[in-house]
């Protein structure tokens, strides 16, 4: 079993917990328009990582975009050695079926999440400071959707 799969198994209790969506304990509504859904997920990710859904000071990086099936894009982010980071990509389930994410350093994949889902995530403690690349690939939009809205978010946890 790959290390990323073991890490995902360790996160199952966290992933099965309700996501913050305005009121503690409520689930994000997958039928919301993409921008509203992603705004709720942004707060939910901050809440999971820092205990505060409005702690934007912990947000190292945040971008939104849209990709068609099979398309990918990259984002550059600076990470510090020894920092604890949570890296999330979420796509709006009203148009998205599967999105994948990889973290690269000096062209080498150091973390990846290729599970069949709409919320790839992982934690990392970099062994070196520097520029890292987040590659987002829209594996599958829902039928009838030319592109899917997504966001990528990096949160410093310590």
Identify the residue ranges that each predicted region occupies.
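Acidic, Ser/Thr/Pro-rich low-complexity intrinsically disordered segments
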Residues: 61-147, 155-158
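Cleavable N-terminal signal peptides
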Residues: 8-9, 19
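Bacterial N-terminal signal peptides that target proteins for export
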Residues: 1-8
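C-terminal edge strands of extracellular/lumenal beta-sandwich accessory domains
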Residues: 22-58, 103, 131-158
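N-terminal targeting/docking segments
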Residues: 2, 19-20
């Amino acid at each position: 079993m790959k290390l990323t799969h073991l890490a995902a198994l360790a996160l199952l209790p966290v992933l099965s917990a309700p996501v913050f969506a305005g009121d503690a304990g409520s689930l994000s509504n997958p039928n919301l328009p993409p921008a509203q859904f992603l705004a709720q997920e942004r707060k939910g990710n901050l809440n999971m990582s820092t205990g505060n859904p409005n702690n934007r000071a912990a947000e190292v990086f945040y971008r939104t975009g849209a990709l068609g099936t099979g398309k990918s894009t990259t984002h550059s982010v600076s990470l510090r050695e020894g920092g604890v980071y949570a890296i999330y990509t979420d796509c709006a389930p009203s148009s998205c079926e599967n999105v994948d994410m990889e973290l690269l350093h000096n062209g080498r994949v150091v973390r990846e999440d290729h599970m069949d889902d709409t919320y790839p995530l992982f934690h990392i403690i970099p062994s070196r400071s520097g520029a890292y690349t987040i590659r987002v690939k829209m594996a599958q939009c829902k039928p009838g959707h030319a592109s899917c809205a997504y966001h990528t978010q990096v949160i410093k946890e310590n």
